Structure formats: structure tokens, C-alpha cells
Regions:
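Domain-scale recognition of functional cores that engage charged ligands
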Residues: 1-169
Length: 169
């Protein structure tokens, strides 16, 4: 991907690929995920669990740490979010606890330090996204989306979606 320029400098932040190894040893791409890319949180949790359960084995295997990947993801989202009044707020948008990857959403939200929100937690007013809190509305500067784009805005995309935020797109 070296030398590729994205339109308006907007790059894809997260991409996941489901791989399978064939009996002859070749790798095959089974699925290509850019919508709600999952897997990184599971890899993180797996490493944390194994490092606590088998600390000597984990050290001896010299497993690559993922902290730098997550720090880069977090820093990139904060850096490229539009500047506004007050501190930059990035949220992780999830379809909710009935989604098969909700565990990962909750884990990533906590690890990255971003509030975990559902569509009902957000509102759009005057072209800006706001997080509804007990203390009032807080401006949202960036959204790490963990649901397919077609479900994000029931006004513009899928009128049957109860997961999105009216006016988000």
C-alpha cells in the first residue's frame, strides 16, 4: 500500500481479513471485512488471558504485543477528528449486546478509553453528532463504527434499522 493516496486524505482505519489454510499449506482469504472489522479485540483478550494463565510459556514464545497497534488506532482517531470546543470525544458505536461481537466492542471501548454507545445514545442536531449524557449533550468528534454502514442512519439508508442515528449520514 506504499504510495497510495486516499481521496481527501481519508484512510481506512481498520480492516480485517478471515484467513484459512488449505491442506497444501497455502493461505486463502475467506472474507474481507471493512464494515465492522472484528478480531483485533479477540486477539488482545487471547494474549492477555494466555499471558496470565501461562506466563512462562508466553514469555518464552516472544509473542508480539498489540499495544502499539491499539495506541496508533486511538491516536489516529483523536488526531484526525475535527477540532472543536473542549476535549476531543471519540465514541465506539455498537449495535448492542445482542450482536455476536459485542464482547469485543466492550473490550475495545474500555481498552481504547472511548465510550461504548448505541444509536439511542446519540443525536444529530444542526449537522453535528452529540452524545446524550446525564449532564447534557457532549459533542462527538469521531465515531469508531462497529456496525454495517447501512444500519447507521434510518432516515437515509434503512428505514427498518433501529440501530442507527437519524441524520447521521
Amino acid at each position: 500500500c506504499a504510495g497510495i493516496r486516499a481521496p481527501q486524505g481519508v484512510y481506512l482505519y481498520h480492516h480485517a481479513v478471515d484467513l484459512a489454510r488449505s491442506p497444501d499449506g497455502r493461505w486463502w482469504v475467506m472474507n474481507d471485512r471493512t464494515q465492522a472489522a472484528s478480531g483485533a479485540g479477540y486477539a488482545l483478550e487471547n494474549r492477555l488471558l494466555v499471558s496470565r494463565t501461562f506466563p512462562k510459556l508466553y514469555r518464552d514464545m516472544r509473542v508480539q504485543h498489540l499495544a502499539r497497534f491499539f495506541a496508533t488506532l486511538r491516536d489516529s482517531l483523536l488526531h484526525f477528528a475535527p477540532r472543536g470546543d473542549g476535549p476531543t470525544l471519540v465514541v465506539l458505536l455498537t449495535p448492542g449486546p445482542f450482536n455476536e461481537t459485542y464482547f469485543e466492542h466492550a473490550l475495545l471501548s474500555r481498552y481504547l478509553g472511548f465510550p461504548l454507545v448505541e444509536g439511542g445514545d446519540l443525536t444529530v442536531r444542526n449537522g453535528r453528532v452529540w452524545l446524550k449524557t446525564i449532564g447534557g449533550l457532549r459533542r462527538v468528534h469521531a465515531i469508531l463504527r462497529r456496525q454495517d454502514d447501512s444500519y447507521c442512519d434510518p432516515l437515509e439508508l434503512r428505514s427498518d434499522s433501529a440501530l442507527g442515528v437519524a441524520g447521521l449520514t
